[in-house]
Swiss-Prot record:
Main localization of the protein described in the UniProt heading: Golgi
Residues in the signal sequence: none
Gene name of the record: mnt1
Coiled-coil residues: none
Family label: Belongs to the glycosyltransferase 15 family.
Transmembrane segments: 7-29
Catalytic temperature dependence: Optimum temperature is 40 to 50 degrees Celsius.
Name of the featured protein: Alpha-1,2-mannosyltransferase 1
Entry's EC annotation: 2.4.1.-
Amino acid sequence: MSSGPKYMRYLLFAAVGLAVFFLISRSSIPIPENIGSKLSPANYKDTISQSDKAHNDAPPKPPVKETPGSANTAPVGRVNATFVTLARNSDVWDIAKSIRQVEDRFNRNYHYDWVFLNDKPFDDTFKKVTTSLVSGKTFYGEIPKEHWSYPDWIDQEKAKKVREEMGQKKIIYGDSESYRHMCRYESGFFFRHPLMLNYEYYWRVEPSIELYCDISFDPFKLMKEQNKKYSFVLSLYEYYDTIPSLWDSVKKFMGNHPEHIAEGNAMGFLSDDGGKTYNKCHFWSNFEIGSLEWLRSKQYLDYFDALDHDGGFFYERWGDAPVHSIAAGIMLKKEEIHFFNEIAYYHIPFTHCPTSEQMRLDLKCHCNPSENFDWKGYSCTSRWFQINDMEKPEGAEEQS
């Protein structure tokens, strides 16, 4: 009699097993035979498998058209801004180095867009290499011919003779025609390119630059929140033989447009005698973060148009650095121009490296502070600190 309960348990287990088998056999959710292949990482690329796509009769929705500076490219909390680079196809590997510097030190955390501009169409290699390196969206634009050619009022024979004379004098880029077109374009047109029109701020990046320190904040956000219009990391004196008549053109502009000259401006950075002469100080424009809205303003466009018609981009060799610097110095208030001491930077042959040892350690810098250019005799950064009554950073006096 003691075996009765045992048999009852066996019968109960058998009944439960039959019930489970019956439910599984009647289920409308079949177990996939190829479950192993479905779990392959290769299938994660598409949210819809190829077999599912074949059975989807509905036409696919068109992709959202992304335009530079649109809501599609500016996540919440990020400023409407872009990096911008003027480059040739042959610059691809040099600009690749620059992109890695910018991405590793800053943009991998922010994913800002990058606009590339060229007077010729970009080739596939340039596009593939740069797109693969930039964490944000990339855009490629061709410069309109009218922005990279001689305006009607320029005597091209006279311009050619000037290039030949400067070449004989061994003035750097003095005999270069393309360099003059580049300087004119950077001075008056890059911010008018259709790809740039929807952005508010830009950060200019050139081939073969280095960023020596981590950038632990968003410079674009600082510019916007503190109402800065222009910024720099290096400043120096311009080569006078390239700009002998530039200040005369500037003074003529100031006389014709006093409404464009700001009170509390940075004239003291540009001139030692209240504007009578130019001391040749300028911000080095191969690094600059600035306001595109300011460059597109009437005051700046009037300024560029006046200089452009005077012909110095071609009859001399006016650079975009003094052109931008003078504009900022006379048309902006001093507090609207910012010095980024924290952004350690190199462009041949000059280095900006923070003098504070603690800052270099905190920002994981790898620059040699003895190579810092800021406080050397040919730099104008001391003058910038002086006119703003700013205290020089720790360690600066040791390098003076």
